[in-house]
Amino acid sequence: MSDSQQSIKVLEELFQKLSVATADNRHEIASEVASFLNGNIIEHDVPEHFFGELAKGIKDKKTAANAMQAVAHIANQSNLSPSVEPYIVQLVPAICTNAGNKDKEIQSVASETLISIVNAVNPVAIKALLPHLTNAIVETNKWQEKIAILAAISAMVDAAKDQVALRMPELIPVLSETMWDTKKEVKAAATAAMTKATETVDNKDIERFIPSLIQCIADPTEVPETVHLLGATTFVAEVTPATLSIMVPLLSRGLNERETGIKRKSAVIIDNMCKLVEDPQVIAPFLGKLLPGLKSNFATIADPEAREVTLRALKTLRRVGNVGEDDAIPEVSHAGDVSTTLQVVNELLKDETVAPRFKIVVEYIAAIGADLIDERIIDQQAWFTHITPYMTIFLHEKKAKDILDEFRKRAVDNIPVGPNFDDEEDEGEDLCNCEFSLAYGAKILLNKTQLRLKRARRYGICGPNGCGKSTLMRAIANGQVDGFPTQEECRTVYVEHDIDGTHSDTSVLDFVFESGVGTKEAIKDKLIEFGFTDEMIAMPISALSGGWKMKLALARAVLRNADILLLDEPTNHLDTVNVAWLVNYLNTCGITSITISHDSVFLDNVCEYIINYEGLKLRKYKGNFTEFVKKCPAAKAYEELSNTDLEFKFPEPGYLEGVKTKQKAIVKVTNMEFQYPGTSKPQITDINFQCSLSSRIAVIGPNGAGKSTLINVLTGELLPTSGEVYTHENCRIAYIKQHAFAHIESHLDKTPSEYIQWRFQTGEDRETMDRANRQINENDAEAMNKIFKIEGTPRRIAGIHSRRKFKNTYEYECSFLLGENIGMKSERWVPMMSVDNAWIPRGELVESHSKMVAEVDMKEALASGQFRPLTRKEIEEHCSMLGLDPEIVSHSRIRGLSGGQKVKLVLAAGTWQRPHLIVLDEPTNYLDRDSLGALSKALKEFEGGVIIITHSAEFTKNLTEEVWAVKDGRMTPSGHNWVSGQGAGPRIEKKEDEEDKFDAMGNKIAGGKKKKKLSSAELRKKKKERMKKKKELGDAYVSSDEEF
């Protein structure tokens, strides 16, 4: 093919035939044209003249359909000639215009031709093709043309997915604008094209949110909820321009929301997204949308804390984007611009004789080079493959390759090189060798860090609470870590803390069998190897203690033939014997293990390597925990629980009437026994103990011995089968359960602040309202039928309303039902009026109405000013005492918190009412060593009593004085100093509370000043003054309180 006289003559004849073709022979002639153009090529020539005529034919209404049909046939040829391709792309604007033609046939042919061109063009030539489509859709007012272009863009995603991903920053604004078109057909097509385009966002973290992100573009009212959803998402994949292009429209609108909370949340996400950006050019195209919104919010938001967060995001954006002090937005790099690469090509060709007719081909080469730069393709052979066919159109192959290689070198000099991994000295089979980033919600945890694991090695992970240890484990298990091998390549099993409650009635054997890990015989053998008896294998999971549940989860993981075991605090629920068994198993099983543990002795006995969180990186240290501490001095804080900068503080408990010393018993249990319904013997029996404000008690014993059952009876979760349990009338007990998340699992979509407001909105703790000691059972109902003789009439108590001091105890105001015809068929009980209320001493009431008395006692305690105002500031201050930042308390949903942060929230909520006794069931389960050290110090300084169930002798050795050893259902106390009466020691004086007091509605209670006792002389003087006034005024005299 050439512009020689012979070729021109043939093409002119074909074009004449094409111009007068009818619908019947149009396809045949178009096919002849395509075959000729894509046939044998005469070297160094192009069909410039023919395509010029073809362009005129497309613009002519009479020949448009035929001309476009020829283009479609040319594009549909399997061997599209490089000499033809650049010229076809130049026809796209004219074809787009015809897609909006009034003639339906021309419309249809134009739409089909656009699809054919998109599918035929080299994907790396997208920078030559896409601008024609986006310019046409912006400039046209014809809705049919817009729909055809949108269909072509959707087809382009399939034809050139990787290349479209890089063009998303300029494509998304065009599609977004089209989604607001007034024509519903255009809206639908634009939404479909946007959905198709977002397939290029290869980011597992936001895949499920993409429909919501698209919906936000069409419906801005969805922005607040979507911002919340993204705030609780774990980001582990690299944030690319494609990811930012779909996220930034949401965030820019979030910055413009009326609600301060959404503006603030958007700023937090921007702040943390920017921290993941190492190349300023990635964020550069989006600075114009984010920077003005942040600046405006910083200047106008009234909330100082939200303004501070906005300023932090602003500083981060300026730093990452290289924004100057004058806030002038720097230019985006032009290295990948077609104009830049065209200039380079023209400079290299200036000494060559290149005819003007090849100008379009040269521009096409520049467009391909620009895309290769954007894709960071720097391989010489790749450039030869993509560009040589076009450059040899006007140069000999050798010359073309020489110039092309120089073009490549000039273009890629400043492209960042990918990460280099240092080889380990340790030999062995690699299971994993990857680089990735990790975030949790709006917090960046790891940024472009390396993880390399070998087969049959044992690794421990260390780091402060909230740094992302458990998040990393879950991300690995869920396949969300970039570069980590899939489950097919390397079976990775995450051993959970707890077994899902939905399996509580399933037998141990069936539970493992349902996982599809083998036959029942093989499962049974493995469970026996793990220490399970035949009886335990047959019992339901709910009957297992926490330690045995952990062993069951571990056994199931081993049965799955794991290559890597992920163990998150495996010793939490295990006693000493089972911990020793686990150490031996991990050291001999030959399975790679990654362990998170706050037990330094366990890490010493198991680990060969320690992986430490340092900054936003993972750093590996060879050796066990002791060796790690030697190499990393900063890790010495792990050795001593009290060696930490983190501080916890529990609120001071309120005054208890009648309790003059810290030794006086405020809880006392005598001859107590408890047996679960349906069991053959009591779980605990013959239990005697007492607790005071000075108690520091450790409850120890093997798994299943009855420790948690004993504490449940103490706190009122369970009622004893027999025996007596005395609790001071105003005593408040904070109980943090072994499975701490049980407190908050139904409130995951609330913020911590909202959860505390919900829990205490009535003044009472709603978490304790369903305790057994507050529920009226059949025995209580029968006892409450007791008949009292009041003023000679038989009465039953209808309600107890208030309380007042009576000698050394209390008496209670009761309303009654009056009995008529008692013992007869016509017996009835009639409500009496309030004037018939009477006061009954506590001793008489508790025999039959103890739970009603307890309710009044609780309300009286709250009415005396123990209630705290449920304001954001008060809640944030209280939670900060337990190590929770205001950012987390008021602006993060519970679902997005780490395990350690959730337990801190449970501690904060449990101590909101200033308890007198704090009961902790396995507090070492989820807190890291820093937090455990802070908890240890706070418990030492706490003014109330402390009871701890734990297997960790290290945690309790310097904290507790009294030990309750529970074994086989019996409790043996030691180290106790129980007293009868007040006991010795310093006296507790009731403090005049200087702080403001509030009732249950948050209203300030005015505290009256205590009256000064008058002397005898002052009393006589006042009496004389009263007598004088009475004499002067006569019957008009009315005395006042001030006169006495």
Swiss-Prot record:
Q: Which reaction does it catalyse?
A: ATP + H2O = ADP + phosphate + H(+)
**What EC class does the entry list?**
hydrolase
A GO molecular-function descriptor? ribosome binding
The answer to whether keyword Ubl conjugation applies is yes
Residues carrying Phosphothreonine: 972
Q: Where in the cell is it found?
A: Cytoplasm, Cytosol
The UniProt entry, under Pfam families, shows: 4HB, ABC_tran, HEAT_EF3_GNC1, HEAT_EF3_N
One GO CC term on file: ribosome
Q: Which UniProt keywords apply?
A: Acetylation, ATP-binding, Cytoplasm, Elongation factor, Hydrolase, Isopeptide bond, Methylation, Nucleotide-binding, Phosphoprotein, Protein biosynthesis, Repeat, RNA-binding, rRNA-binding, Ubl conjugation
**Which residues does this entry mark as bearing Phosphoserine?**
642, 974, 1039-1040
| Subunit structure of this chain's protein | Monomer. Interacts with elongation factor 1A (eEF1A). Interacts through its N-terminus with 18S rRNA. Associates with ribosomes; preferentially binds ribosomes in the post-translocational state (bearing a peptidyl-tRNA in the P-site) in the presence of ATP, suggesting that ATP hydrolysis is required for ribosome dissociation.
Q: What is this protein called?
A: Elongation factor 3A
Its gene name is YEF3
